[in-house]
Amino acid sequence: MTTAETLRPALRRVLAQDAGTSADAHAIAAAALRAYERLAEVLTPLFGEAVINAVCARSVHLAQREFSWLAPAGSAEPHDAPITHVRVSLERQDPAVATDAAVAVLATFGELLALFIGDSLTTGLLRDAWPDAFSDDTTRETTT
């Protein structure tokens, strides 16, 4: 399996574990921000904050194709991660739509990362950020 095939279900688990299964859009937006922050915490020492923010901005831009209401990636202050403005956009949506959009942004981030460093390394880093989201079987299939 590739990162793309396993990432979206894993991200739904991340958001559900953090926000709860019957969460409102505010809780989902907060969970998405925390998920991004955990990922950035793992990736920033390896790639630097500027690279992480650039990949995030690109992820938001690509997700806007499906969710045109997402905050423009360029609307963030230079020192803010683009995801901070996405949170406001997510809070204004129906919970199901907010979940789909949050998953799209975070999954696109993971997919872009996989293009740069490969599926195996990406899966390992994603597992470091969200250890409960990936089952052992999924990780074994992805890394072998």
How does the language model describe each region?
Residues 1-144:
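Long, compositionally biased intrinsically disordered regulatory segments in eukaryotic proteins
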